[in-house]
């Protein structure tokens, strides 16, 4: 992609309204534009990251055996009345009426709707287990939206829902999603800690929030430092096997959000040098809620004995748009963003230091063509900006590699490759640079 044909509205100054690093850098890097309090347009650079984050989530959900569908953003109020949640949810729910005066709402979550879908089609335990998921925009009318996409009113979520014949089977589904979450976040280069948490308005008797430790986090968290060194399951994980040892390993050490934190237990179960008391960013949460929705909605299935019973269920959310902000909070320096390669909007940024010079232009064109042919995402800065501005721009938007091409280096048959994360610079021939960037 040539920058001259791209839309990248870089801001030169730090936006005054941005309170945290991720919000400031997303605005400066031309990733988002605020349209109203807590509501953003995703501009091309930001959308590329959002799509890559969503694709990793999708791949790991599919790997774990979940099945994708798509539910609407608008829901009927009557559906929520069946479970008693319409009145109980509070002012965060945006309630509307259509032209026929039917009460509707902009969905903050989808447990009620997915239960209605399930009861319409599934009748027997023989059709179970099932895990269904979707990736969809949601709306919660936060009283004080802040921190950019970290606490917006409109946001993109992945929600999965499990359906099982009994509690034992439902707990297995919980473990399956728990393990898949470890993989999702690890693929993005994030160290995330599952912590015991309140179930809140979703309900149920078991929940874990997946937390990134960060001083800019919204809530206090407490954990044993040992959780930072636990192994992540690799791509060979067998989701049909026994996952309980992995879950037990990750939940045996103390880790809790402030809502369920027990100071006495924390002191007993950890040593002084191992205690971490800090703040955290929630990027996902899993719930086991049993028959909380199936029972009031009469979503019953016939068991092996022929007797009908409510299905046992769970709910599993990942904040896709929030993850973009969390990734920046975890990966930045004074110059800008440092994207992990798996979610970077482009892998390589090419800086042409003398646009109009025949040799420099030709080298850049060869580099661009070779990388794009190999399937590498490239942003080619072919603008007339001075070199310093180009370097600052590439550092700000955080692409993993920068290919710096100018007459001085080319006179010696070299171009420079800079690795954004380490700052390492190496001079290579054009062909060597192409080979290295494709292989990286």
UniProtKB/Swiss-Prot annotation:
EC number: 6.1.1.15
Top-rank EC class of the record's enzyme: ligase
Catalytically driven reaction(s): tRNA(Pro) + L-proline + ATP = L-prolyl-tRNA(Pro) + AMP + diphosphate
GO terms of molecular function: ATP binding; proline-tRNA ligase activity
Keyword Nucleotide-binding: yes
Cystine pairs: none
Keywords of this entry: Aminoacyl-tRNA synthetase, ATP-binding, Cytoplasm, Ligase, Nucleotide-binding, Protein biosynthesis
Example GO biological process: prolyl-tRNA aminoacylation
Record PROSITE patterns: AA_TRNA_LIGASE_II
Pfam families in UniProt: HGTP_anticodon, tRNA-synt_2b
GO annotations of cellular component type: cytosol
Cell compartments where the protein resides: Cytoplasm
Main subcellular location of this protein, as a coarse class: cytoplasm
Family label: Belongs to the class-II aminoacyl-tRNA synthetase family. ProS type 2 subfamily.
Biological role: Catalyzes the attachment of proline to tRNA(Pro) in a two-step reaction: proline is first activated by ATP to form Pro-AMP and then transferred to the acceptor end of tRNA(Pro).
Quaternary structure note: Homodimer.
The protein's name in its UniProt record: Proline--tRNA ligase
Gene source species: Methylocella silvestris (strain DSM 15510 / CIP 108128 / LMG 27833 / NCIMB 13906 / BL2)
Recorded name of the encoding gene: proS
């Amino acid at each position: 992609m040539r920058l001259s044909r791209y839309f990248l509205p870089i801001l030169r100054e730090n936006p005054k309204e941005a309170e945290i690093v991720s919000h400031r850098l997303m605005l400066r890097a031309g990733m988002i534009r605020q349209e109203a309090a807590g509501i953003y347009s995703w501009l091309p650079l930001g959308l590329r990251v959002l799509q890559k984050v969503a694709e990793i989530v999708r791949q790991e959900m599919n790997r774990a055996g979940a099945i994708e569908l798509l539910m609407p953003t608008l829901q009927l109020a009557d559906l929520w009345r069946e479970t008693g949640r319409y009145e109980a949810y509070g002012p965060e729910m945006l309630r509307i009426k259509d032209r026929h005066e039917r009460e509707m709402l902009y969905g903050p979550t989808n447990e009620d709707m997915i239960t209605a879908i399930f009861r319409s089609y599934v009748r027997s335990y023989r059709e179970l287990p099932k895990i269904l998921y979707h990736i969809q925009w949601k709306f919660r009318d936060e009283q004080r939206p802040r921190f950019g996409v970290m606490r917006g009113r409109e946001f993109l979520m992945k929600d999965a829902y499990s359906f099982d014949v009994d509690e034992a089977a439902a707990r297995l589904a919980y473990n399956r999603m728990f393990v898949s979450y470890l993989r999702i976040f690890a693929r993005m280069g994030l160290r995330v800690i599952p912590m015991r948490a309140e179930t809140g308005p979703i309900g149920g008797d078991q929940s874990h929030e997946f937390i990134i430790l960060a001083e800019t986090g919204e809530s206090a968290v407490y954990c044993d430092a040992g959780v930072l060194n636990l192994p992540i399951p690799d791509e060979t994980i067998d989701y049909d096997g026994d996952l309980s040892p992995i879950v037990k390993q990750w939940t045996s050490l103390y880790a809790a959000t402030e809502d369920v934190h027990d100071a006495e237990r924390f002191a007993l179960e950890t040593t002084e040098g191992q205690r971490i008391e800090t703040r955290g960013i929630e990027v996902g949460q899993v719930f086991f809620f049993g028959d909380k929705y199936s029972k009031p909605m009469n979503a019953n299935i016939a068991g092996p004995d022929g007797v009908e019973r409510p299905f046992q269920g769970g709910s599993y959310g990942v904040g896709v748009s929030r993850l973009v902000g969390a990734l920046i909070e975890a990966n930045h320096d004074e110059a800008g963003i440092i994207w992990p390669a798996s979610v970077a909007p482009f892998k390589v940024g090419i800086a042409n230091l003398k646009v109009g010079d025949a040799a420099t232009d030709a080298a850049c064109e060869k580099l661009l063509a070779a990388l794009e042919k190999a399937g590498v995402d490239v942003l080619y800065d072919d603008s007339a900006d001075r070199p310093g501005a180009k370097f600052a721009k590439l550092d700000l938007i955080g692409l993993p590699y920068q290919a710096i091409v100018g007459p001085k280096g080319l006179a010696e048959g070299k171009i420079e490759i800079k690795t954004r994360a380490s700052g390492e610079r190496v001079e290579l021939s054009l062909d060597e640079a192409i080979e290295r960037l494709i292989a990286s």
